[in-house]
């Protein structure tokens, strides 16, 4: 069972770029592993580092700014997670420490993969995201409160409402991924299998 997501308060980092694709999130040369850990070191590798080996940080990239170290909420622009359908993208984001991504829109496959990996993708309007960028840029180090149960983001003096599909919301709040959902019916599955002829087992 995955970690339950109900509420999260975290430091916000503003990535002011639209159409951030999955190859930018986790470049293809780092996709050899099939486990979910270790990808955070290569998150935004071509932007975070000046060298291919990822040993020389790029001082001009926002994730490297001192005031955003330890950020767990990523604020982005429209069509986040576009490009190829690699599940490694949410793996890299969560392994780095992100719990929430806020953007006006997400690529469909990335959006679904995020829920499967307990990464909450929050959709707000363009105008609301503009407000949040202005707020973060005026208050570096600001924290947002994200409440999945209430479907609200509290930022500064304002509260922003978002909507999540009821089934996905239930799964995240109960720490259920695809395997967890199946295991909820373990007794019924076992009972069904016991009733099958021996040659079908």
From Swiss-Prot:
Spans traversing the lipid bilayer: none
Keywords: Amino-acid biosynthesis, Branched-chain amino acid biosynthesis, Leucine biosynthesis, Lyase
GO BP annotations, alphabetical order: L-leucine biosynthetic process
Molecular function per GO: 3-isopropylmalate dehydratase activity
Group of enzyme by EC: lyase
EC number: 4.2.1.33
Catalytic activity, reaction form: (2R,3S)-3-isopropylmalate = (2S)-2-isopropylmalate
GO cellular component: 3-isopropylmalate dehydratase complex
Pfam family, one: Aconitase_C
Pathway(s) where this gene product acts: Amino-acid biosynthesis; L-leucine biosynthesis; L-leucine from 3-methyl-2-oxobutanoate: step 2/4
Superkingdom of origin: Bacteria
CDD domains: IPMI_Swivel
HAMAP family, alphabetized: LeuD_type1
Family named by the database record: Belongs to the LeuD family. LeuD type 1 subfamily.
NCBIfam families, A to Z: leuD, PRK01641.1
Assembly, per entry: Heterodimer of LeuC and LeuD.
Its biological purpose: Catalyzes the isomerization between 2-isopropylmalate and 3-isopropylmalate, via the formation of 2-isopropylmaleate.
Name used for this protein in its record: 3-isopropylmalate dehydratase small subunit
The encoding gene: leuD
